[in-house]
Protein backbone atom coordinates (compact mmCIF):
# COMPACT_ATOMS: atom_id res chain seq x y z
CA UNK A 1 0.00 0.00 0.00
CA UNK A 2 2.38 2.69 1.20
CA UNK A 3 5.51 0.66 1.78
CA UNK A 4 5.22 0.01 5.49
CA UNK A 5 6.63 -3.16 7.06
CA UNK A 6 4.48 -6.22 6.37
CA UNK A 7 2.68 -7.10 9.59
CA UNK A 8 -0.38 -8.84 8.19
CA UNK A 9 -0.77 -11.37 5.38
CA UNK A 10 -2.81 -8.78 3.50
CA UNK A 11 -0.79 -5.71 4.43
CA UNK A 12 2.49 -6.19 2.63
CA UNK A 13 4.21 -3.73 0.29
CA UNK A 14 1.19 -3.12 -1.91
From Swiss-Prot:
Keywords: Ion channel impairing toxin, Neurotoxin, Secreted, Toxin, Voltage-gated sodium channel impairing toxin. One of its GO terms (cellular component) is extracellular region. GO terms for molecular function: ion channel inhibitor activity; sodium channel regulator activity; toxin activity. It is found in: Secreted. InterPro entries: LCN-type_CS_alpha_beta_dom (IPR044062). Residues 1-14 form the LCN-type CS-alpha/beta domain. Expressed by the venom gland. Binds to sodium channels (Nav) and inhibits the inactivation of the activated channels, thereby blocking neuronal transmission. Causes prolonged contractile paralysis in C.partellus larvae. It also has significant toxic effects on B.fusca larvae but not on mice. Belongs to the long (4 C-C) scorpion toxin superfamily. Sodium channel inhibitor family. Has the structural arrangement of an alpha-helix connected to antiparallel beta-sheets by disulfide bonds (CS-alpha/beta). This is Insect toxin PlIT. It comes from Parabuthus liosoma (African black tail scorpion). The lineage of its organism: Eukaryota, Metazoa, Ecdysozoa, Arthropoda, Chelicerata.
Amino acid sequence: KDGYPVDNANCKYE
